Amino acid sequence: MLLYSDLTYAINGAAFHVYNKLGHGFLEAVYQEALEIEFQRRNIPYEREKELKITYDGVELKQTYKADFVCYGKIIVELKAVSALEDAHRSQVYNYLHATGYKLGLLLNFGSSDELEKERIVL
């Protein structure tokens, strides 16, 4: 069974709704604001631009990472508005998971003209 499958299903449903309403072509900030509204409407618990501590070899760093969203207190949701996801985007989420101790990240790209691109990244 997939990690947090029911929770990611709810998050993806909200993201699909936003993509179907807005389509592609907006800045990432537009999708972030719309997705926040959709999370509220669907009672999906979230924190927007949550500052996360990063640890290196057991030591907490001064630098932090701001996740676009953390949903349900355990899923990092990273938004993009680019023509296609690239390995650098996947690596970014993987590194965030590794550095913060979270186990699951969702990478959502609203910039594709074909459909909402979504990827699960599991640590």
Predicted regions and their residues:
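Solvent-exposed, charged helical/coil patches
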Residues: 1-45, 121-123
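Gly/Ser/Thr-rich beta-alpha loop segments that engage phosphate groups in nucleotides
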Residues: 25-27, 60, 103, 113
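A short acidic/basic microdomain associated with nuclease active sites
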Residues: 40-57
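Nucleic-acid nuclease catalytic cores
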Residues: 80-123
